[in-house]
A protein has these predicted regions:
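Surface-exposed, charge/polar-rich loops and edge strands
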Residues: 1-38, 95-410
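Short Gly/Ser/Thr- and charged-rich N-terminal loops/segments
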Residues: 13, 56, 80
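Intrinsic-disorder-associated, low-complexity terminal segments enriched in Asp/Asn/His/Tyr and depleted
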Residues: 42-48, 69-75, 81, 87, ...
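Short hydrophobic alpha-helical segments enriched in small aliphatic residues
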Residues: 47-51, 58, 65, 76, ...
């Protein structure tokens, strides 16, 4: 099947790009999008045959309207087609999709006791280094470690670099490396002279956060970014970019989720710099997905499987958690322990086996992440939902608002 890159394009005004997060974090807006239920009381059919949705949810019968006492008073109205009800979007195949404008702190009202939210506990490391070759300033962004103390990295002005070049990086630590190899996508393999604890300390002193290129920081990251660009779950060093859906959570929100009987599990996927690389193939099925290292412990796999067996939905917080879970699931929907690289590339037509609900930020046009949400909730549904988000003033990308999506193939 041919998937044209242009099919995943959309117009995004520059003023919709968020350059700083809202405060508090859980005050960010949350766009619920579902085809056969979800924010309106959806329960997965593999568990809830004939069982009434949990308390506080409206019926999942087709055409049932959301409860007025729970509707956001700031509800934005669709502008694409005035003939459609304000909470309906074009659907993919069987059903109309419906939306609801909420805020992140409403999440406990949108989930049920026994659901399990799966969060990525990776911690962002300072990974951007600068050096000079002659008069040229070279920016190196570490991507992921390789064998024997080497790193794969992305290099700006990579054409100036050659195998065997010795790089001495700016900063007080005298950090240095030699280029072992180059690849065609601006990547290099580096061997640093410093190793282990000495290398980690040098990074802390000499490197800066590798903020996404769409976040405007003319003079580099600001002091607030050191905390703003980490999730409350951050525990395991290794990511170059934040798992941004997790940025919306606060201790207060977690307390309410726990009090409602909503479970939580931790996985680790170290988000690499490759997440920022554009898709260059017109037929996107030819795109080579970057690999990232992830882990799911045996206890986490057991907790997720138990939640599903007990009737709970698997709620992935972010595309990183989703891709890792889908990399570790078998044909029956059981999660196995996992430790290794994943380069799973999800396009429309993919059959999801692990995840029922996805919370994720709003993504770039033509990106692999927008392709993923189209696969999860339906391409036409997501194109219409993003058009609604633009018209309603939602904030996009890493520091922006979030969406709550439900698998339309159920």
């Amino acid at each position: 099947m041919v998937f044209r890159l242009a099919n995943f394009d959309f117009e995004l005004p520059p003023d919709r790009i968020a350059h700083r997060p809202v405060r508090p974090r859980d005050a960010a807006r949350l766009l619920c999008v579902q085809t056969s239920g979800g924010c309106f009381g959806y329960q997965p059919d593999h568990v809830y045959h004939g069982v009434r949705p949990c308390s506080g949810h409206a019926s999942s019968r087709p055409g049932h309207e959301t409860g007025g006492d729970r509707k956001n008073p700031q509800d934005a109205r669709l502008t694409q087609d005035s003939a459609q009800p304000s909470n309906q979007l074009p659907g993919d195949g069987r059903n109309l999709a419906r939306i609801e404008d909420r805020v992140v702190r409403d999440l406990p009202d949108l989930l049920c006791p026994g659901d399990i939210v799966v969060v990525n506990d990776t911690r962002v490391i300072p990974a951007q280094l600068t050096t000079r070759l002659g008069n040229a300033r070279i920016i190196i962004t570490l991507d992921q470690p390789r064998a024997e103390g080497t790193w794969h990295a992305l290099a700006r002005n990579a054409r100036r670099l050659h195998e065997g070049d010795k790089l001495r990086f700016d900063g007080p630590s005298d950090l240095s490396a030699v280029i072992l190899a180059r690849d065609l996508d601006g990547g290099v393999i580096l061997r640093f002279d410093q190793q282990d604890a000495e290398f980690d300390e040098a990074l802390r002193r000499d490197a800066s956060l590798a903020l996404p290129p769409y976040i405007s920081r003319p003079h580099g990251p600001e002091p607030a970014d050191a905390t703003d660009y980490q999730t409350v779950f951050a525990n395991n060093d290794g990511a170059v970019a934040a798992p941004t859906a997790g940025l919306h959570f606060t201790p207060a929100l977690l307390t309410v989720l726990e009090a409602r009987g909503i479970l939580r599990a931790f996985v680790t996927l170290h988000v690499g710099a490759g997440t920022f690389l554009p898709v260059r193939s017109d037929d996107v099925s030819h795109h080579t997905m970057h690999a990232e290292y992830g882990e799911i412990s045996a206890s986490t796999a057991h907790a997720i499987n138990d939640a599903r067996a007990g009737g709970g939905r698997i709620v992935a917080i972010g595309t990183t958690s989703l891709r890792l879970l889908e990399s570790a699931v078998d044909a029956s929907g059981m999660i196995a322990p996992f430790a290794g690289q994943t380069s799973l590339f999800i396009l429309p037509g993919y059959r999801f086996r692990a995840v029922d609900v996805l919370m994720t930020n709003f993504h770039l046009p033509r990106s692999t992440l927008f392709m993923l949400v189209c696969a999860f909730a339906g391409t036409e549904t997501m194109r219409a939902a993003y058009a609604h988000a633009v018209a309603a003033g939602y904030r996009f990308y890493s520091y922006g608002d979030a969406s709550l999506l439900y698998r339309y193939d159920r």
